């Protein structure tokens, strides 16, 4: 009996070992390395994204545009000369998320570099829910003036998705499909009421905590102000190849009063690399 009991135990251990070996391994997806956005036959931007050996963003290079290097020192990421008029943008990290951002510009009166905009981000867990902003501008005779916005950005979540972004009296609502957002696809609800352009798919978006769980289906912009009758609608279409989103189309319609709708169709192509 002892012999059979021993053999039975060996069989159980073997089965448990096989169970551990059979656990599915989630493959690491390649990183977004190229984005091309066009409208009709016109290329709006063509961007290469380069990475360091430890998978950090090394630079974002726009063909016929800025080449933007990233510098890493301790918990700070610095984006150099991201656009005309901005000397650099500094991001402070806590763990894997951005907790504040400082936009630095040159003072035209004394050439001093100053913080023109400071954003402090608020999270619930790893989900971004809001940001405050301190805006500063130089005075011709010296010194600075500033203004604080406690609720510069507000994000509302439902079922793992950002369904509403608000700023003052402006609103943009999002609806989602049942398709899941791949972990390497950096689309994000950005603080904009015209969500087109490179910023919606910048890899920096992956540093703002949880992305929306699902891919967007549509978005609608409107204002609660009686002085602003502009509305806009956006429809999203995605093409997937295996685990990767290889293209995205955004159909934009902008309405203002009784004028005919302004229509645009933006086509994005995505390339990935290890």
Predicted feature residues:
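Positively charged n-region of N-terminal signal peptides that target proteins for export
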Residues: 1-4
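C-terminal motif of bacterial Sec signal peptides marking the signal peptidase cleavage site
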Residues: 14-17
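Buried hydrophobic residues that stabilize the cores of well-folded domains
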Residues: 20-274
């Amino acid at each position: 009996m002892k012999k059979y009991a021993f053999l039975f135990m060996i069989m159980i251990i073997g089965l448990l070992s096989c169970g551990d070996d059979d656990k599915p391994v989630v493959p690491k997806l390649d990183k977004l390395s190229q984005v091309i956005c066009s409208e009709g036959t016109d290329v709006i931007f063509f961007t290469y994204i380069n990475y360091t050996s430890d998978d950090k963003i090394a630079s974002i290079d726009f063909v016929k545009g800025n080449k933007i290097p990233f510098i890493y020192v301790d918990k700070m990421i610095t984006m150099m000369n991201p656009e005309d008029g901005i000397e650099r943008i500094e991001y402070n990290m806590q763990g894997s998320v951005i907790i504040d951002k400082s936009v630095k510009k040159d003072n035209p009166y004394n050439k001093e570099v100053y913080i023109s905009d400071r954003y402090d981000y608020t999270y619930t867990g790893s989900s971004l829910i809001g940001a405050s902003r301190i805006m500063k501008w130089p005075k011709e005779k010296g010194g600075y003036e500033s203004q604080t916005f406690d609720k510069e950005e507000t994000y509302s979540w439902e079922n793992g998705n950002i369904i509403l972004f608000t700023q003052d009296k402006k609103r943009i609502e999002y609806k989602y499909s049942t398709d899941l957002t791949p972990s390497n696809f950096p689309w994000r609800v950005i603080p904009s009421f015209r969500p087109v352009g490179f910023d919606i798919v910048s890899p920096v978006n992956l540093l703002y905590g949880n992305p929306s769980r699902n891919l967007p289906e549509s978005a609608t912009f409107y204002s609660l102000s009686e002085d602003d009758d502009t509305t806009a609608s956006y429809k999203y279409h995605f093409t997937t190849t295996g685990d990767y989103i290889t293209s995205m189309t955004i159909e934009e319609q902008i309405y203002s009063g009784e004028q005919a709708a302004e229509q645009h169709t933006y086509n994005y192509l995505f390339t990935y690399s290890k």
